[in-house]
Design a protein with these regions (language model features):
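Glycine- and charge-enriched low-complexity intrinsically disordered segments
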Residues: 88-125
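Short coil-to-beta-strand transition motifs
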Residues: 77-84, 113-115
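Short, positionally conserved secondary-structure boundary motifs
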Residues: 1-55, 94, 122-124
Length: 125
């Protein structure tokens, strides 16, 4: 399964417009439990996702998995920002995202500003 450091995820060239991994710079880890051939791993860096995810934790992201309210998701904006949040609500016009860390603000984004959103299906905690 492709693996990328979370800090690198905002840089260009690692994802296509659908949120699928592309390009060079990806490492690999063995993870047989996910059936989505497009799933990939991100290694957490920093403390912005505490207490849910710690530095060094690995999350498995599935671009093909259906997303429901309450799911933890990776979101990439058209500005290139990549974030991990909990999906609070999605409408035809906007997406409301709840932060995992109380020190960071919740976000409401116009749907047109979201390039892609993919569900986190597993975490190494």
């Amino acid at each position: 399964m492709p693996l990328l450091g979370f800090a690198q995820a905002g840089a260009g060239g690692f994802f296509d417009d659908g949120g699928f991994p592309v390009g060079k710079g990806w490492d690999e880890i063995a993870f047989p439990a996910v059936s989505d051939e497009h799933a990939y791993a991100l290694e957490i860096s920093g403390d912005s996702m505490l207490p849910a995810y710690r530095r060094g934790d690995v999350i498995i992201v599935s671009p093909a998995a259906p997303i429901r309210r309450g799911d933890r998701v990776v979101v990439k904006t058209r500005d290139g920002e990549v974030m991990v949040k909990e999906l609070a609500r999605k409408t035809a016009r906007s997406v409301e995202l709840q932060s995992l860390n109380a020190a960071h603000a919740d976000r409401t984004l116009p749907l047109r500003d979201v390039l892609w959103m993919a569900r986190i299906v597993w975490a190494s905690q």
